Amino acid sequence: MTLTSIGPANRMARSAETHPLTWRLREDAQPVWLEEYQSKDGYAAARKALTQMAQDDIVQTVKDSGLKGRGGAGFPTGVKWGLMPKDESLNIRYLLCNADEMEPNTWKDRMLMEQLPHLLVEGMLISARALKAYRGYIFLRGEYVDAARNLNRAIDEAKAAGLLGKNILGSGFDFELFVHTGAGRYICGEETALINSLEGRRANPRSKPPFPAAVGVWGKPTCVNNVETLCNVPAIVGNGVDWYKTLARPGSEDMGTKLMGFSGKVKNPGLWELPFGVSARELFEDYAGGMRDGFQLKAWQPGGAGTGFLLPEHLDAQMFAGGIAKVGTRMGTGLAMAVDDSINMVSLLRNMEEFFARESCGWCTPCRDGLPWSVKLLRALERGEGQPGDLETLEQLVNFLGPGKTFCAHAPGAVEPLGSALKYFRAEFEAGISRQPSAAPRPATVGA
């Protein structure tokens, strides 16, 4: 699996003007350490932010750029930063980097942290300056051992060079940065569950309001941003808003570039930095190379396991939030998965729902009970032992676990692929209905 934007399918020469995230990558995929990073304008944006810009000007620059969160939700970053309190007496503030990348079929943040650790450090330094945060934590997926090692080395290098710690670059600004490895729970991708875990608590989502900007880690104002989001900040501050807005393709409502990828039985699975608005067909055919010989594209997901399935006819959709919404799902992380014609959708959904059921924190009843119920029904259908009404029950579960009906977005993301699979591949589910009726009574509705 290609973990960089380098590859035979990438015909674009990477430069600072067109590939702000990946232009510094080495051809051998080794980490870019401080000396090399600084030789490629590394920390120039941080110097500008700390010595030439007011803190509020940094926030306004990011807001004007149109940068949105790259973790899947797509909330405007500058708006989120603007929620931090203006009261100067609240001088203990935290910046958290959500690096708990556990979405199946997603590995974009891993590449950035392993190969460009100083880009994340610089992005967090600038962001902390804007937010008046004196301490930052990178909440890292525990399995990312190489990323942890490289980030800790980058932090040590930055400290030794006076780029972290006290009075950074003579600006009077202090910022300490730490790596915290998680314990392996998918729910920690939700920002308040992440905060609870960092505090040493059970990783349950918190009720909002209050939002983390008001009451976050250890009760203090806190901002949580994704790895890729923070890595965009240096280029925006360094090159300006007008430049950043020229990167996306015409028609895209999202600005800048995005790390996108394709996995599955494609000829060239990989990860590429591409402008928002590129068509999914271009990503699939020109970059991923289409399907391997002997396989046909049956369906695809645009951005992780928590997004809905689409058909080959939907490949002309533009890869940005609004473009994917037009064909019925979310862009998510932007790393697509191809489902080939050898895959049974019932088996695939059973596998996916087992994952989501296992990763539920169990805090709210619909998610705690509904997801295992869906797994039970899918297992029966997979064995050919489904009963009449099972598909209708699954559809009710999709409805009852949908947006706004559970404590957080875990359950809605879990049932989105299930709902789309029932819509597009219903015959495969119907094939799992047994011709012999069960003697056991079956509930008529989900709520019974």
Curated annotation (Swiss-Prot):
Residues noted as binding FMN in the record, renumbered to the chain: 182-229
Binding positions for NAD(+) per the UniProt entry: 69-78
GO biological process: cellular respiration
Requisite cofactors: FMN; [4Fe-4S] cluster
One Pfam family per UniProt: Complex1_51K
Enzyme kind, highest EC tier: translocase
Database matches in NCBIfam families: nuoF_fam, PRK11278.1, PRK13596.1
Name the UniProt record assigns to this protein: NADH-quinone oxidoreductase subunit F
Family, per entry: Belongs to the complex I 51 kDa subunit family.
Binding residues annotated for [4Fe-4S] cluster, in chain numbering: 361, 364, 367, 408
GO cellular component: respiratory chain complex I
Keywords per UniProt: 4Fe-4S, Flavoprotein, FMN, Iron, Iron-sulfur, Metal-binding, NAD, Quinone, Translocase, Ubiquinone
Molecular function per GO: 4 iron, 4 sulfur cluster binding; FMN binding; metal ion binding; NAD binding; NADH dehydrogenase (ubiquinone) activity; quinone binding
Keyword Cytoplasm among record annotations: no
Catalytic activity: a quinone + NADH + 5 H(+)(in) = a quinol + NAD(+) + 4 H(+)(out)
Subunit and partners: Composed of 13 different subunits. Subunits NuoCD, E, F, and G constitute the peripheral sector of the complex.
Key word Repeat present: no
PROSITE patterns: COMPLEX1_51K_1 (PS00644), COMPLEX1_51K_2 (PS00645)
Native organism: Pseudomonas aeruginosa (strain ATCC 15692 / DSM 22644 / CIP 104116 / JCM 14847 / LMG 12228 / 1C / PRS 101 / PAO1)
InterPro entries in UniProt: NADH-UbQ_OxRdtase_51kDa_CS, NADH-UbQ_OxRdtase_suF, Nuo51_FMN-bd, Nuo51_FMN-bd_sf, Nuop51_4Fe4S-bd, Nuop51_4Fe4S-bd_sf
